From Swiss-Prot:
Domain of life from the UniProt record: Bacteria
PANTHER family: TELA-LIKE PROTEIN SAOUHSC_01408 (PTHR38432:SF1)
Protein name (Swiss-Prot/TrEMBL): TelA-like protein SAS1347
Entry's family note: Belongs to the TelA family.
Organism whose genome encodes this protein: Staphylococcus aureus (strain MSSA476)
Length: 378
C-alpha cells in the first residue's frame, strides 16, 4: 500500500497568531493574505457594539461543528476495534507453524516393503495436512483482505476528518483575529470617543454608555478566549487523528506483508520440503532396490546350482515306463470320447434352445399385435 502523502504533512501551526499565551494573543496582520484579510474584515463587521446576543452567537456555529466533529471522532474510534485483526494475524501464524518441515524426516527402514509403505504414508500424511492448512490459510487470507479494505477506507475517512479539522482550525483562527481586530477598534476608537463625550456631558447616561462599552469589550475578550480554547482543541485533534491513521496504516502494511510475502514464502518452503522428502525417500528406495537385487542374484545363483544338480540326476534316470505310456494313451482316448459326447449334448441343447427362442419370439409378436389392436379400439 502506498503511504498516504498527507501522513508526512504535520498539522499547520499558528500561521496567524505567534504568541504562545492564548489570552494575550496579538494580531499578526503581516501573515495574512489579501483574501484572508478580506475575510477577517467581513467577519469583524458581524460584531455589533453592545449587541450582547450577537456576540454570544459569534463563532457559535463553528463551535457546534467542532462539537459534532468531536462526536464523529469518538464514534469512529469506538466503532473501529482492531482486536479481530490481531486475532486473525495470530491465527495465521498458528496455522503456518502447525506444519513443521522438520516433521518430514523419516527413519530409515531396513526392508524394501517398509521403505515404500512408510515413505508413501509419510508423504501422503504431510501432504494432506499441508493441503488442509493451506485451505485454512486461504480463508484467513480472505479475512485479512477484508480487514485491509476496511483499514484503507478508515484511513481515507480519517483524512476527511483531518481536512475538516484543518478547516475548523483555519476558520476559528480568522474569527479570533476578526474579534481581536474589533476589540482593538473599540478600545482605540469607540471607547475613547464615549469617554470623551461623557467627560464633556452632564448626562449620566453617557457615563453608563462608557460602562456598557467597557463590559462589552470584556465580554468580547472572554468570547475570544472561548474561541481560542476551541482552536486549541482543533490543534490537539490533528496529531490524534494522525496517530489513529498510523496504527491503521501499520496494520494494513502488516496484512499486506503477510498476504504478499509470508504466505507465499510458507507455501514455497513447504513445496521445497516435500520435494526434498521425496528425493530422500527415492534415494533410500534405490539403495534398498540395489541391496535386494544383489540378494536376488546370490539366491538365484544358489538355486541355479541346485537345479543343475537335480537336472543331471534326473537325466540319468531311464526312459519313461511302458505302463505310463499305456495309461497316458488310455486317458487321451477317454478324453476324446468324453469330448465328443459333450459336443453332441451341446448341439442337442442348442437346437432345443433355438426352438424355444423361436416360440418366445412368436409369443412376443402375438402379444404385441393384441396390444396394438386393443389400443386402436380404445
Amino acid at each position: 500500500m502506498t503511504e498516504n502523502k498527507s501522513f508526512k504533512e504535520s498539522h499547520p501551526l499558528d500561521d496567524f497568531i505567534s504568541d504562545k499565551e492564548l489570552s494575550n494573543t496579538t494580531i499578526q496582520k503581516e501573515k495574512l493574505t489579501i483574501e484572508q484579510q478580506k475575510q477577517v474584515d467581513t467577519i469583524s463587521k458581524q460584531i455589533n457594539p453592545l449587541d450582547n446576543e450577537g456576540l454570544l452567537a459569534f463563532g457559535s456555529d463553528l463551535q457546534k461543528q467542532m462539537s459534532q466533529f468531536s462526536h464523529q471522532m469518538l464514534d469512529e474510534v469506538q466503532s473501529k476495534d482492531v482486536g479481530p485483526i490481531g486475532d486473525t494475524l495470530s491465527d495465521l501464524i498458528s496455522k503456518l507453524k502447525s506444519v513443521n518441515p522438520n516433521e518430514l524426516n523419516t527413519d530409515k527402514p531396513s526392508m524394501l516393503k517398509r521403505i515404500f509403505s512408510r515413505a508413501k504414508s509419510s508423504i501422503n500424511e504431510i501432504f494432506s495436512r499441508m493441503q488442509s492448512v493451506s485451505a485454512q490459510v486461504d480463508r484467513i487470507t480472505i479475512q485479512l483482505q477484508k480487514h485491509q479494505t476496511h483499514l484503507t477506507r478508515d484511513i481515507e475517512l480519517l483524512d476527511t476528518l483531518y481536512d475538516k479539522n484543518k478547516q475548523y482550525f483555519d476558520d476559528l483562527s480568522l474569527h479570533i483575529i476578526a474579534a481581536q481586530q474589533k476589540k482593538l477598534q473599540l478600545e482605540n476608537e469607540k471607547l475613547p470617543q464615549l469617554q470623551q463625550q461623557a467627560q464633556q456631558s452632564t448626562n449620566q447616561m453617557d457615563i453608563q454608555h462608557v460602562a456598557d462599552m467597557q463590559q462589552f469589550i470584556d465580554r468580547l475578550d472572554k468570547r475570544i478566549y472561548d474561541l481560542q480554547l476551541s482552536r486549541q482543541i482543533a490543534l490537539q485533534t490533528a496529531p490524534q487523528i494522525r496517530m489513529i491513521q498510523n496504527v491503521n496504516q501499520a496494520l494494513a502494511e502488516k496484512i499486506q506483508s503477510s498476504i504478499l510475502t509470508s504466505i507465499p514464502l510458507w507455501k514455497n518452503q513447504m513445496a521445497i520440503a516435500l520435494t526434498l522428502m521425496r528425493q530422500r525417500n527415492a534415494v533410500a528406495a534405490q539403495r534398498a532396490v540395489t541391496d535386494t537385487t544383489n540378494d536376488l542374484l546370490t539366491a538365484n545363483a544358489e538355486m541355479l546350482k541346485q537345479n543343475a544338480i537335480e537336472t543331471a540326476t534326473e537325466n540319468e534316470r531311464g526312459i519313461v515306463d511302458l505302463d505310463t505310456l499305456k495309461r497316458t494313451q488310455r486317458n487321451i482316448i477317454e478324453t476324446i470320447e468324453e469330448t465328443l459326447i459333450i459336443q453332441q449334448h451341446g448341439r442337442e441343447e442348442r437346437q432345443l434352445a433355438e426352438k424355444e427362442l423361436q416360440q418366445l419370439e412368436q409369443d412376443l409378436k402375438s402379444h404385441l399385435v393384441n396390444i396394438k389392436g386393443t389400443n386402436k379400439q380404445s
